[in-house]
């Protein structure tokens, strides 16, 4: 059984810090739905990220990511990305053919390895890692297709700790993903992620420096988790 199912919705608040004070800068959400592609059952996962309109004059963000992943093995079949970040705009569409080991985008067809993820499906892949199989400091390898390239990345397991968020206190699993440098985030192991230490592994908090300042993302609500949120110590 996977850590999530159709109907799951997770809501986040994004806080921005540039002079030592965190301000409510935006919101994000992830939703999971059932659908079919060529009669194959898939999870249609949508990730939305928006800056608050009052801060759009500083850096406007209107991002939408979609992935369609096979319900049997969590391999992505299709990936869509619409990005508006400051003056940067990008639309991307990728179709994965795992039988032929290819990924076809608007720019061409590329060879891919057998186990490949897109930038959104990789989040749900990571949620299904059994971290009890790893020691603190271990690297968990992953392969991602992004911007028409295959990237060998990893997650570094950092152990377990209690994390206090705007939504409550939780027993959490901490890891650091190796990021690919983009318009907002720097590359490397600068981001820290805490997920619930229970069967859901939902993201509870994300902290990372960005091009200017830093961001903190807190989980603020959810619907239809697959399992009880047993990691919660106190809070809502």
Task: Locate the predicted segments by residue.
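Acidic, serine/threonine-rich low-complexity disordered tracts
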Residues: 1-96, 134-236
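Hydrophobic, well-structured mid-protein blocks that either form specific transmembrane helices
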Residues: 88-131
């Amino acid at each position: 059984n996977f850590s999530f199912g159709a109907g799951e919705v997770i809501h986040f608040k994004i806080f921005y810090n540039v002079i030592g004070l965190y301000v409510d800068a935006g919101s994000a959400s992830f939703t999971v739905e059932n659908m079919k592609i060529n009669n194959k059952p898939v999870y249609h996962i949508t990730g939305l990220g928006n800056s608050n309109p009052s801060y759009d004059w500083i850096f406007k963000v209107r991002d939408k990511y979609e992935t369609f992943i096979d319900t049997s093995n969590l391999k992505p079949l299709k990936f869509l990305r619409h990005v508006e970040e400051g003056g940067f705009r990008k639309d991307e569409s990728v179709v994965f053919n795992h039988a032929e080991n290819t990924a076809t985008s608007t720019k061409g067809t590329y060879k891919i390895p057998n186990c490949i993820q897109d930038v959104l499906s990789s989040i749900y892949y990571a949620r299904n890692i059994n971290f009890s199989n790893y020691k603190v400091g271990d690297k968990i390898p992953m392969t991602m297709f992004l911007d028409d390239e295959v990237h060998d990345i990893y997650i570094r397991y950092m152990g377990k700790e209690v994390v206090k968020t705007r939504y409550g206190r939780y027993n959490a699993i901490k890891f650091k993903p190796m990021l690919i440098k983009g318009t907002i985030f720097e590359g490397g192991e600068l981001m820290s992620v805490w997920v619930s230490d229970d069967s859901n592994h939902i993201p509870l908090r994300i902290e990372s420096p960005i091009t200017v300042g830093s961001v903190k993302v807190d989980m603020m609500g959810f619907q239809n988790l697959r399992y009880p949120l047993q990691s919660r110590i106190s809070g809502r």
